[in-house]
Amino acid sequence: MTAPALLCEVHGERDDGTGRPSLYLTFDDGPHPFCTPEILDILAEHRVPATFFVIGEFLADQSKLIQRMIAEGHHEVANHTMTHPDLSDCEPRRVQRQILETNRAIKMASPGGGAAHPRAPYGIWTEEVLKASANAATHAVHWSVDPRDWSSPGADAIVNDVLQSVRPGAIVLLHDGCPPDEMQQGADHSLRHQTIMALSSIIPALHDRPLCIYTLRLLGSSEDPMDIA
């Protein structure tokens, strides 16, 4: 039996009339009460959408941020598990719970939404995680560009890494928060400062290429036919 596919890039043209190749900005580990609003502000300034892979445990306290993402009309809320465990260490039932409970939390915060594409914490995928994604009729989403912004390499390093690595169909990994077990008291305001600074330079540079930035919302939809690699 063939294992379910893992999406690292999106191939194929979007039928939006622009004729420009696509690119996908994604953010992991939020929503964060200070970092996520700043990232949303930058995206709004440049009229750019993004896909946010959220941690379910945060949603009860940060439901207004999820509602803002939805209200702005073009962002996607996706699934980064309930507590951000290494799923390769989890029994199959726990893997299912991590994904399904996060889907429920997302739907509670944004009623009317469908099942959310999952992304495995740390990018560690197992056959069980891929099966759980397929059973939920979603695509397991990885990435093709990772500037390791979580390690705070400097805003310029983040910008350079992204711009040197992107190509049409690329899925870019950035972070707007951090896992629950990595939260450091007193560091909230500066947590993703480098990512926020870098994003203000990355978006205009991508537009100059030119590349069109989209969400992953319509993957697999007849409205938006694409080939998945």
UniProtKB/Swiss-Prot annotation:
It holds the Pfam family Polysacc_deac_1. The active site is at D28 (proton acceptor), H175 (proton donor). Its EC number is 3.5.1.-. It is found in: Cytoplasm. One of its GO terms (biological process) is carbohydrate metabolic process. The keyword DNA damage does not apply. Residues 21-214 form the NodB homology domain. One of its GO terms (cellular component) is cytoplasm. Keywords: Cytoplasm, Hydrolase, Metal-binding, Nodulation, Plasmid. GO terms for molecular function: hydrolase activity, acting on carbon-nitrogen (but not peptide) bonds; metal ion binding. The record marks D149 as: Raises pKa of active site His. Its main location: cytoplasm. The keyword Metal-binding applies. A divalent metal cation binds at H80, H84. Belongs to the polysaccharide deacetylase family. Is involved in generating a small heat-stable compound (Nod), an acylated oligomer of N-acetylglucosamine, that stimulates mitosis in various plant protoplasts. This is Chitooligosaccharide deacetylase. It comes from Rhizobium leguminosarum bv. phaseoli. The gene is nodB.
